[in-house]
Regions:
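Short, well-ordered beta-strand elements
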Residues: 3-14, 34-39, 62-63, 114, ...
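Extracytoplasmic/periplasmic solute-binding protein
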Residues: 105-118, 123, 147-207
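Hinge/lid segment of periplasmic solute-binding proteins
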Residues: 1, 68-124, 138, 181, ...
C-alpha cells in the first residue's frame, strides 16, 4: 500500500532505542511497504532538534521517539497530531491492554491521545543476588542500605576475572540520563503523600521543593556512591552501565526494565544471578514547612511499608 514512501524518525542514537526500531522496522516495511529512515542523535540533542525542526516548519521528521515528560512542550504549540480517533478506530492496537498509567498519563494530554507508548518507563534497583546471598545480606530497602552494600563489595573481584570491580554502577554523565536517576533517589525524601503531593513544587503554593534536606540527602548519596563506582562514572551513561552490570562488574545498579532481558542474553556473565526490586526508599521525609528531615510516622508516610 505504501510502496515507495518513507517515514523519517528521530531518536537517541546507539543500541538502546535506535537499533530496536531499525530491527522491528524491517518487519514493518515487509508488511506495509513503507520504508523507515532513522536519525540517531545524542540524548542531549533530541529535545532541541525536535523543537527547532517542528517550530521552524522544516518537518525533517515525521515521528519522534522521546521521553513523555517533553510531550506538553510539543503539544501546546500544535506540533503533534491528535491521535485519539485513530487509536480508538484501530482494534489491532488493543489500546486497553496498555497499562493505565502509561496509557492515560504518558500518552495523553487534556483528554486527548498524542503518543503511543513504546515501553513503560519506571526505575528499579538491580542487585547481584548470588553475591548478597553468599554474604548473608538482604537487598537494599533504603538508599542508606544501597550505599552500605555498595561499599561492602567495592574493590572486590565480582566476576572471577582477577580484577577489582565496583559496588555500584550509575549513569551520571552530564546531559545524559542521570537526572532521572537522581530524581528517583530524591523522591522518597520529598514525596510521602502520593504523587498528588508533588515533587518539584508544592502544589499548595507552587514553591520549589529543592532547597531542603531531602534533596541535599540525594546529592550526598550521589557524591558518596561515586566512591563505589567505576573511576569514570561521572562520564558514563546507562548504555555503559548496562554493559558493566551484565559483564559482572557491578554489585548494584539503577535502571529501567532493560537490565532484565540483557541479563539473560547471550554473552551475559550474570545469567540467573540478578535480583530486582522496587526502588529503595527512606525512613525520613522532609517537613515541607521547615525543609528539615523528620522520621516517618503513619500520618506522615501513609504509603510506607515497615516504616520505609
Amino acid at each position: 500500500k505504501y510502496d515507495g514512501m518513507t517515514i523519517n524518525i528521530i531518536t537517541t542514537g546507539g543500541y538502546t532505542i535506535k537499533q530496536p526500531i531499525i530491527d522491528h522496522g524491517k518487519k514493518f516495511t515487509e508488511l506495509t511497504g513503507l520504508k523507515i529512515n532513522m536519525t540517531g542523535v545524542p540524548f542531549s540533542d533530541i529535545y532541541s532538534k525536535m523543537l527547532t525542526d517542528f517550530g521552524a516548519g522544516t518537518n525533517s521528521y515525521d515521528v519522534g521517539v522521546f521521553p513523555p515528560a517533553w510531550m506538553v512542550d510539543f503539544i501546546v504549540p500544535g506540533y503533534l497530531t491528535d491521535l485519539t480517533s485513530m487509536v480508538k478506530a484501530d482494534k489491532k492496537l488493543n489500546w486497553n491492554d496498555v497499562v493505565p498509567f502509561f496509557r492515560d498519563f504518558s500518552a495523553s494530554f487534556d483528554g486527548k491521545i498524542y503518543t503511543i507508548p513504546v515501553d513503560g518507563d519506571f526505575h528499579m534497583a538491580y542487585y547481584r543476588k548470588d553475591l548478597l546471598e553468599k554474604e548473608g545480606m538482604n537487598p537494599p530497602t533504603t538508599w542508606d542500605d544501597y550505599l552500605r552494600i555498595a561499599k561492602h563489595f567495592h574493590g572486590k573481584d565480582l566476576n572471577g576475572d582477577g580484577e577489582a570491580d565496583w559496588g555500584s554502577c550509575l549513569g551520571k554523565k552530564r546531559n545524559g540520563q542521570g537526572y532521572y536517576i537522581i530524581n528517583s533517589i530524591a523522591a522518597p525524601y520529598i514525596q510521602s503523600q502520593g504523587t498528588g503531593s508533588g515533587m518539584f513544587f508544592n502544589p499548595e503554593n507552587m514553591k520549589p521543593l529543592v532547597n531542603n534536606e531531602g534533596f541535599a540527602k540525594a546529592l550526598e548519596f550521589w557524591k558518596e556512591s561515586t566512591q563505589y563506582g567505576p573511576p569514570n562514572e561521572l562520564n558514563i551513561d546507562v548504555g555503559d552501565t548496562r554493559g558493566m552490570f551484565t559483564s559482572g562488574r557491578c554489585a548494584l545498579t539503577v535502571d529501567w526494565g532493560d537490565i532484565g532481558p540483557l541479563a539473560i542474553a547471550e554473552g551475559s556473565k550474570v545469567v540467573d544471578k540478578v535480583g530486582s526490586l522496587v526502588l529503595p526508599g527512606s525512613k525520613e521525609v522532609i517537613d515541607r514547612k521547615t525543609g528539615k528531615l523528620v522520621s516517618c510516622t503513619k500520618s506522615i508516610c501513609p504509603h510506607a511499608v515497615d516504616g520505609v
